[in-house]
Amino acid sequence: CHGRLLDLMGQGHVILDAIEITVIDEADHMADMGFLPMVRRVLDKTPGQGQRMLFSATLDAGVDVLVKRFLHSPVVHEADSSAPVGEMEHHLLGVSAAERGDVLAELAAAPGRTILFTRTKHGAKKLTKQLIGRGIPAVELHGNLNQNARTRNLDAFHHGLVETLVATDIAARGIHVDDVALVVHADPPAEHKAYLHRSGRTARAGQSGTVITLVTPDQRHEVAALMRAAKI
């Protein structure tokens, strides 16, 4: 990670003077997490004449700072810009706190691949355990898992051995699994870009998909603002 790299640079163990190609992935996510100052410090130590590639789901203000400062005469490539866009249906489902577990279990048991998103690692682990306890095969994906467990669970989901994946936002970034029929926001995300990233796991490559957000009474105003920001 960039923090560890900066530590090694500060100790004199790593020198970036001879770097010819620099790749910045998930730039928008690093901006959201407040990591851009560290990224800039790393880039400042690479040769200005080298090749730099930046990958981002969005090009908003935070990412644009990197573009203007470090990319000279940049060329923009939009992945799948001409690909057919599938139909994505968005639904809000009002539930009480007492009903939430039963509703999530019913959604997870529906035919087809389903991804349920939670805000926290603990929430993902707890929900996975609850689903398995109800006889619904499910795997979890979050930051508390080691790499072997992450790979094993994702492979099981990818190959159809398990059709329900419970994930956190950060762990699920970069997941590319086709034919996800349903995305469930078990916990509404904190901001609209996370909502769009989560929802984008379905309706890919011309396929249709459904997105359901569970809303408890105390979340109504928060979710209404979220939908407006996401232009849903």
Describe the role of every protein-language-model region.
Residues 1-232:
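Conserved helicase RecA-like core
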